[in-house]
Amino acid sequence: MKTYFLVLCLAVLAVASKPVPFRADSLTISVGTFTSPSAVWHKGSPKHPQVFVWFHGGMQSSKCAKGYEAGGMLVPYLEKSQKENIVVSVSACKENHWLTPTVLKTVDVMLDSVEARFQIQIDTVSLVGVSDGGLGIAGYTLYGKRAVRARLLVSTNLSAVSDARNLSKAIRVRQGSWTFLQGGSDRLYPSNRTMPWLDEFCSVLGAKQCVIHFDNRGEHDWSWWTANREGWIRDFVP
């Protein structure tokens, strides 16, 4: 009897300690005539989560439903976190790119829907952008309605937004941290074009607020960074 009771207790303990997997829920967010396929990743019903917003690359692609899957690429880095986390991603598409007011508003409408669903308040967010998803980070930083705690920009080029010195002086840009992962073998955004901009941008913000991780072997795709510089990504995700 004692042995049976012990085995039963161990079985219950094993079930209780088994990590709860993230669940992905898909939805569409509409702003005016624009409809954005979107998704939210969560564990159960979080009460005080950190919220991450993923801005996908290929913002003017004719593949207009990237938001259904894009944010899922961050989930493996949150699985073992002791904190409650939510990831959301929306879709940009063709002329509705990351720097248009409509798509930037879509992000906040999505966050509003997450607030309503889980009965929580989202005051601050962390942003992750890959390739031209970095433009979404810049746009939301300047025009989004929520404060930004931290940003991770992977293989990006923000020179289309503004020159580095002027952008770094914007009040909202100076709130929250900036972390850049940039590669020397990025064929889309060559380092001889991107690094001078980044160096000037971070020189104004200062080393405590703005960090550049450069790998001369680094390629453009997120998959290269997950395979070769996973530690830099984990440093961003608590």
What are these regions (language model features)?
Residues 98-118:
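Alpha/beta-hydrolase active-site loop
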Residues 3-13:
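Sec-dependent N-terminal signal peptides
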Residues 117, 123-172:
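Primarily recognizes the serine-hydrolase "nucleophile elbow" in alpha/beta-hydrolase
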Residues 48-97, 160:
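Short substrate-entry loop that stabilizes the transition state in hydrolases
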Residues 15-51, 130-132, 139-144, 196-201, ...:
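A domain-start/cap signature at the N-terminus of enzymes
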Residues 47-51, 83-86, 121-124, 145-151, ...:
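Loop/turn elements at helix/coil->beta-strand transitions in domains of secreted/extracellular proteins
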Residues 54-62, 115-118, 130, 137, ...:
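Cell-envelope and extracellular/periplasmic
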Residues 150, 155-230:
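The feature captures the conserved acid-bearing segment of alpha/beta-hydrolase catalytic domains
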